Amino acid sequence: MDATITTDPAGTATPQTGAVKLTMLLAGVVFVLMMVFGLTMRLAQGGVLDLPPELFYQILTAHGAGMVGTAGLTGATIMWYFTGRHVPLVAGVFWAFLGLFLLGVVFILAAIFLGGFAGAWTFLFPLPAISGGLWEPWAAVLFLLGYTAIGVGFLLLHLEIGRKLIGAWGGISGALAWPVAFGAGRPEDAPPPAVVAAMASTIFNTIGIVVGAAVLVASIVNLLVPSFAV
């Protein structure tokens, strides 16, 4: 079935164009900053810069989080934009997604450069609590809260996309073009490729976000209540 397409006065389908442009600009700035971080670490490894080991690993932690975060942010924004050309999405959901993402970034940067958190990729239980005195538990908690805030934002975005696609194409199978794929529907009734991709991404990402959030919350509880074992 055909879904409603939202268009601007000029006739071009551009839902929340301003929000999308702002997000892509922010992602570009962060990506450039991560390149600077990467170059700084390489110069330190080559002996050109003299960085204290704790600062090196703080930069490494920020670099890893920033690169993954930038990839996720741009990917979700692009998916939102092209999905919005086929179904009317609620602009407030995207702003909530962006706000939670930025809040998470603030938490993560504060945990790293104010709290000294330098766990890099080893931020899951039980490693955040085993710092060797390099950072306090609150820094690890703040870091994990940052990831949790970002995850909640992504979950809101995916739920909005999934809700609208399911409603427009009569269910998950319809949005995935299964009736057409299995010979029960007409090719002309198949959803656009962007819709199929968005529905598939929404399913897998939603599952991953929920599981990941559960692990993060369990780790936070362990940091606050050490007797609690995950």
Predicted regions and their residues:
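Hydrophobic alpha-helical transmembrane segments of multi-pass integral membrane proteins
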Residues: M1-V230
